Amino acid sequence: MDQIDISCIPTTPGVYLYKDPAGKVVYVGKAKHLRRRVASYFRDIQRHTPKTRAMLRSAATVETLSTTTEKEALLLEASLIKKHRPRYNILLRDDKQYVLFQLTRKHHWPRLVLTRKVRKDGSAYFGPFTSGQAARQTWKVIHKVFPLRRCSDKAFRNRVRPCLYHFMNQCPGPCVLDVDRDGYMQMVRKVEMLLAGRSTELIDMLRADMQAASDALEFEEAALLRDQLQAVERTVERQAAVLPGVHDMDAVGLAEAGGGLALSVLFIRRSVLLDKRNFFWSGLTLEEGPEVLLSFLTQYYGPGSFIPPRILVPWDIRTEDREGAELAPAAVCTDAGLLPDTPLLPDCPEAAPLPAAPVFAVSAGDVMPSGHDADPAGTADAPVVRGDSAPEQPLPAAVPPLCAEESASGSALRAVAEMLTELRGGPVRVLPPRNATDNQLVTMATENAREDARAEKRPDVAGVIAAKLGMSAPPVRIEAVDVSHTGGSNTRVGVVVFENGTPARDQYRTYAFADDEAGGDDTGVLALWAVRRVHSGPPWPDLLLVDGGRGQLAAVMTALESAGAGGLFAVASIAKARNEETGRADRRAGNLADRIFLPGRSNPVNFKSGSPELLFLQHVRDTVHDYAIGRHRRARSGAALSGELQRMQGIGPATARLLWEHFSSLQEMVDAGEKGLAALPGIGKAKAAVIHEGLKRLVG
């Protein structure tokens, strides 16, 4: 990129966007002082990191957007990164938030549900959990011990008879029965105490209630309380405290290992290490640490995510006019040991194994309009773990660096804290370690990041793919396309996206084609799709992978060139392995050598069978294949639903879908009778009679 006229750039806070010659955004950054920040890119270029130098080589222009405050610049930067997915920014997958427990306290009859979004609706939220399966198992166990209602609010309003869970003694049936609300709310409070980690208090309450019921000769009630008490006590045995007196917070650690930069975030709730999440960026070093940390904080804790009241980070980051962001003294380990000038941690202990996340132990995450960091009593209900679950030697007390609220006005963490405070609706503190306890948590996160990077071998798959396919740079964004139809009907083209080797499910797309337009011709449909893809615009892939052979590849290339997108990105196709004798696709008997074709080349590219790069391309192809088939089957099912059932009186799309979800055939619907149909949510006796009569005529 040539030198630009710096005098045209404003001196306000804001966001700058570097664009390549085609106008594609390749990097988004924020600055407290736009002119000085942009000017820093053109001073002593050789001192920049390799990634920054590569970005400057690919950039042709730079644009700026001014804001009034640095906090607004952070919000705008996060929004633009999510929109443009720039090649040289640190990108996090945001297709799926982690699982949370939501207790709908504002409802007259609260229920406990699993959710991935935090809403300011008065509910209490607990978590997060990275394993949805473990969270669902926990949810089932909680309902067996404390049988709250399970039905949705809509089903609750429309239900006319108790559901099956009531007859299994797993729901009191407040939807239609006269249930003691005081007793129900007492059960809700017990669930909240369990999820909030107040196990000791809950056990004492259950034991007292059990004794009172026994003294009153209410032995059935006493037996129920005994079962609840035993279940809670078993739960407490599985809980493990990281540090006594530590409450709701996340601890972030970074380490340079495994040929890249690893980041780990620990979720700590009520002294319990609830879960953790690891990230890795190949080719980065601790020189990019400040950028990685700031980008992580602004992307990971976005709108709708769970934001704790306190976030520990490895360093303070001060925004300097001359260079954007630089580190305060760091407490970070590398493969070679500690970085110079790290007074917080005098040594780098061997990594201690992290305590396993409790199967049934969850904790408080209530989002309140006015936040409260921790229990003022400072008590920890879970037992303190000794031995291997925590560092054996306590870290020495450190001179506390300035936290976000106390630091100089130039601290980038202050702007991050202000942004997260606004999103959370309560105070959020983002700060480096201030004492030995904080040091221990950050060290644990740092060591966990390093060990995860070392344990997982990460071959340079993208680099090998780029070399094999003749690409100028490793592909960051890969799009794969496949067609699915049944005899030319309900044709669907599925597109999946992989970024940095992981699926970007929020960017999956489905393209529908009319039967007369598709005609059952896969190559023709792919050509039509290619034109529509060009018209939809960026973000463009670095590599487009077509599921098919030379014919499908040629059709896509011809369409791209006619649409003016020839050479805009690399294109290849992947075809299943074929039997040498029959010429038919055959992946049996270990024949995994699928063939990769390039435009203008008759013979396939030589990929070693079973190599990581070929297995990755096969995984991408299998993903788009399954996705396209799934979308086609959904379209075919929808057509069947609208065909048979919706011609009947009293059945619309919602009722038709409800019937097909509960029955596998029309005959099963008839056999269920009016009583069975009326038991479905939203279908009363009168409607069930009409539907049953229509079904009998339809079946004949």
Swiss-Prot record:
One of this protein's Pfam families, by short name?
UvrC_RNaseH_dom
Where does this protein chiefly localize?
cytoplasm
Please tell me whether the keyword Acetylation is annotated for this protein. Answer: no
Question: For this chain's UniProt record, which GO biological process terms are given?
Answer: nucleotide-excision repair; SOS response
CDD domains listed in its UniProt record? GIY-YIG_UvrC_Cho
The subcellular localization recorded is: Cytoplasm
GO molecular function of the protein, one example?
excinuclease ABC activity
Q: Which GO terms describe its cellular component?
A: cytoplasm; excinuclease repair complex
Question: What UniProt keywords apply to this chain's record, in alphabetical order?
Answer: Cytoplasm, DNA damage, DNA excision, DNA repair, Excision nuclease, SOS response
Which residues are in the UVR domain? Answer: 200-235
**Family, similarity comment:** Belongs to the UvrC family.
Stated role: The UvrABC repair system catalyzes the recognition and processing of DNA lesions. UvrC both incises the 5' and 3' sides of the lesion. The N-terminal half is responsible for the 3' incision and the C-terminal half is responsible for the 5' incision.
Question: What interactions and quaternary structure are annotated?
Answer: Interacts with UvrB in an incision complex.
Q: What is this protein called?
A: UvrABC system protein C
Q: Which organism is it from?
A: Oleidesulfovibrio alaskensis (strain ATCC BAA-1058 / DSM 17464 / G20) (Desulfovibrio alaskensis)
The record's gene field reads: uvrC
